[in-house]
Amino acid sequence: MSGVWGAGGPRCQAALAVLASLCRARPPPLGLDVETCRSFELQSPEQSPSAADSGTSVSLLAVVVIVCGVALVAVFLFLFWKLCWMPWRKKEASSPSSANPASETLQSPSSRGNMADKLKDPSALGFLEAAVKISHTSPDIPAEVQMSVKEHIMRHTKLQRQTTEPASSTRHTSFKRHLPRQMHVSSVDYGNELPPAAAEQPTSIGRIKPELYKQKSVDGDDAKSEAAKSCGKINFSLRYDYESETLIVRILKAFDLPAKDFCGSSDPYVKIYLLPDRKCKLQTRVHRKTLNPTFDENFHFPVPYEELADRKLHLSVFDFDRFSRHDMIGEVILDNLFEASDLSRETSIWKDIQYATSESVDLGEIMFSLCYLPTAGRLTLTVIKCRNLKAMDITGYSDPYVKVSLLCDGRRLKKKKTTIKKNTLNPIYNEAIIFDIPPENMDQVSLLISVMDYDRVGHNEIIGVCRVGINAEGLGRDHWNEMLAYPRKPIAHWHSLVEVKKSFKEGTPRL
């Protein structure tokens, strides 16, 4: 029978397959022999074409499923190794350092007793104290010292906080935060065995002692004051000759001048000016190698008596140097020639020589009045006149005008100007400048008065400035306080012009 099934070509095989499918149908078709169908059902699976095809497909499917399962298992194992195994190994590697405190707490009583004996030993305490005083450059703490400190803290229940420097910085905070084994040094108590002085002594490594800086600043101030006082004194006399209308200045002597030479002495002489005229300059003789020269020389300045109130006496003391520039020792400026007497008779005057590195330049003076109305909140500054201004043009004159700036906390809020006076060093203005300032803001503002020289080409130049206000200095503050003390009343004063300071410097655009 097997030979019958296996014989034939492809057409026979196809016919047999159709016949086999018809025999498997339930119920079988009419006209189909039952015996023939049984013979088809009893054939071996190897000889059935459909059975062979189905077996092959099942085997391929099984192979694919097995391969996919193996791949999934491999992926699962890889993820488990990455996510669980590696972090666990790292944690296990770092566990000995973290397990030290637990192992230290399980020590035997004998080891604790030995450690307590070490703490009672003065030498051991000295070593322990030195180790606890942590340096900013050496943050590592020995393991033995840390263990002994922890055991000592466990034994003593009473804790005494150690005094530390009150001022803290970010450096100290970051230093404590990055310690590998944190230990609160400020809470360590060494017990009653240590003397009180040692227990209360703060850490000395890396400390900043403010008292040293304070002492240094005080010493610096003392040095400056000593330098200002070490310029010595000068003695001179004044007398006015009414017949010849001449002011007679007699330079008598100087005392305790500073040494300017390497040998410890000086070669002093004195220059005399009657300001604002600097063209007329008189000078004493040079006295060699002395710090206490005696001059005893007379100098005559022809000046009318009515002009004496507007003149200033300027004395400059120099050290003569043959091969280089002469060094200035100091200066004396007498603003009021009638300070000592009416000049009808000779009067001797002693003055301290003020330290200076260069001769002061006389920039002139300005006269203005201040008047404040509290009810209206109105401040009126009246520019009256100027005198003896510095010549800024090549012609020997200036074209001055006055600019007044209202300042608040260093910022300029408003500015106003007067008219320009051409070719004069003694202009007269009589012009009022008004600012609206509430009474509650009067202690926050100040006025900066600038005398300017107008230039048709280029920038306008500053001749000099002065300032009045609650934060001003000298006459500027006194004038402001007098205005506030006498409201509704104009208060007029002369103010000397000074050079522009960096804090007052501002742009000067053309008009």
Swiss-Prot record:
Residues 94-103 have a biased composition (Low complexity). GO terms for molecular function: calcium-dependent phospholipid binding; calcium-dependent protein binding; identical protein binding; metal ion binding; phosphatidylserine binding; protein heterodimerization activity; protein homodimerization activity. GO terms for biological process: acrosome reaction. PROSITE patterns: C2. Ca(2+) 1 binds at D261, D267, D319, F320, D321. Residues 92-119, 157-182 are annotated as: Disordered. Its main location: membrane. It is found in: Cytoplasmic vesicle, Secretory vesicle, Synaptic vesicle membrane. The keyword Flavoprotein does not apply. Residues 104-113, 160-172 have a biased composition (Polar residues). Residues 1-59 are vesicular. Residues 230-351, 362-495 form the C2 domain. The modification Phosphoserine is found at S217. The cysteine motif mediates homo- or heterodimer formation via formation of disulfide bonds. PANTHER family: SYNAPTOTAGMIN (PTHR10024), SYNAPTOTAGMIN-6 (PTHR10024:SF45). This is Synaptotagmin-6.
